[in-house]
């Protein structure tokens, strides 16, 4: 087991500018947009009237992951999140697998969020809008983390105002019927687990807080407080909105709705709120994308430092103190995906990768000693088992695609190890021959 990271051991340190509020807001910006506007309808399709139970399962697993991640982040306050924790606690391979799952899965999620903005702002040119948004937000991140935190705070405020209006309008209308919240015969365990897996994709934004370990002031104190706060606020928002929308639409109509919050306002007779909801959805997806690009670039930075990705990606800008090459490459890849990808496929693939990422986080937390801040063993154990179960409860196409891409990463890791081993053997042989010249 490796010793804790010392900041002096980390080359090209990033600037610590983020406080508790900034860290919480970055987590909120990552979670609220994805969950309310992207995962609610497919989760209802999977769980039917058991949607709220699926939400509860997702919340329990997310809480366990949050506690494990917070304790690990306090122990290892460096950029990279579970990529760093896995390497330090379980070994290089598991850290690499977590990092690969995060970078690839969240890159797909970035494309999904960019396309969400495009479909709400200009459906006829959704892909073009998505690419433009990616370019703009990459520029914001390139200019410095404080600008990103300020913009994220503004986006979260707008989204919360819109969601509050939706909840008040839904509960205040005559269309809301509490009987629609009852669990019927259509609810079954597998469907609730699948819904929990889809909703967990929405909860996963607190990972972005952990990946910013080098940019948070007093990370040992700030991160363990920020992660549960962000998760708790998000859960409260999800529960209020989900109950309101189900009470108006019912689970079956919710499952069929392309834009469930807009549909709920239409049924409730509050048509003037529909364009406000559409703008809120676009802004929420924008907030998610902003934080996603931020987190993916930081994990790319950490992997590049360890040569699991090309070393030149680890460069930190001398003025802005951000991993500018990693951000530019991530932005370019996301822009390419946004120009060509299907949004549903991107979300499904991302969910599998995120659950694998957190499974490794919980396994890492299980190895912490009591003097290292380990949570009660039940917490990471429930988180680990929950992540594995929810990952394989996802639709078969998502599981197959996720497993295939993770397999590519494992193969790349193995090839790299073989090449490195042979290079070392060659160097060792050359050294021995130079030290023992043959007699002639």
From Swiss-Prot:
Presence of the UniProt keyword Amino-acid biosynthesis in the record: no
Name of one Pfam family that matches: AA_permease_2
Superkingdom, taxonomy of origin: Bacteria
Subcellular location(s) per record: Cell membrane
Membrane-spanning segments: 24-44, 47-67, 93-113, 117-137, 155-175, 183-203, 229-249, 276-296, 323-343, 346-366, 379-399, 400-420
Keyword terms: Cell membrane, Membrane, Transmembrane, Transmembrane helix, Transport
Location (main, coarse): membrane
GO cellular component, one term: plasma membrane
Known function: Probable amino-acid or metabolite transport protein.
Protein name: Uncharacterized transporter Mb2022c
Highest classification ranks of the organism: Bacteria, Bacillati, Actinomycetota, Actinomycetes, Mycobacteriales
